[in-house]
Structures are given as structure tokens and as C-alpha cells.
Amino acid sequence: MRASPTSPPEQVVVDASAMVDLLARTSDRCSAVRARLARTAMHAPAHFDAEVLSALGRMQRAGALTVAYVDAALEELRQVPVTRHGLSSLLAGAWSRRDTLRLTDALYVELAETAGLVLLTTDERLARAWPSAHAIG
């Protein structure tokens, strides 16, 4: 019996909001994010890790996560297969979007646009500001 050929994973840009929901497991969106990211090849701008770190730190300071939990989440983040892309080639395009997007969000949008990939987010504000983004959850 021959195995059926498998299709290559879908290439996507994932933003920090989706990864935080996945790692923190504190929102109802965690399962939706996990399901949507299954069998994808993820890409993100290089500032992705800093944004995830900042969000997890805010959650810990607010009492939603323990220090030990954040430590474990950061280890999990280190192991997530996300291809990080340098920022220098994205800066001008992100800057051109300054009137409609937060500049950190514009870096994700610019990467998705220039690479021709879908942007996945759980950030409702980003999804409203850039309708081509696919909101999860």
C-alpha cells in the first residue's frame, strides 16, 4: 500500500498575539490558535520574540501567570519552529503604514505582504485595521 503524498505545510506569518494566546493558555482562543497553526510553517519579523516576552511579562506582573510558568513558556517559545526575518528590509514599508497601523504591527503586515503570505493574529485591532489579516478565534 502506497502512502498518499502529503502537501507541504502552509507558509504563514504569525504575530505575537497569537503566540501569546498559545503559550499563556489563559484565553479561550488557545485551542483555535493551536488548530490553525497546525501543519503550518511559521514566519515572523525578528522583533516577535521581544513582543511575546513583553506580553508574558505584563501577564506575570498582573498576576495572571507565575514566574515559573513564564520561564516554561519562554523555553517553549525557543523551541517553536518560527523563521525569524530581519527588520531592515521591512522598515520602509512598515513606516509607510504608520497612519493605519501601530508600527510594530506594520512589521508583520509588511512581511506578509512582501512574502505573499497570510498573516494570522488574535489581535482584533490589527484585524480591523488590516482586513487581509486572518483573525483567529
From Swiss-Prot:
It comes from Mycobacterium tuberculosis (strain ATCC 25618 / H37Rv). This is Ribonuclease VapC3. The gene is vapC3. Mg(2+) binds at residues 15, 105. One of its GO terms (molecular function) is RNA nuclease activity. Signal peptide: none annotated. One of its GO terms (biological process) is response to host. The keyword Methyltransferase does not apply. Residues 12-129 form the PINc domain.
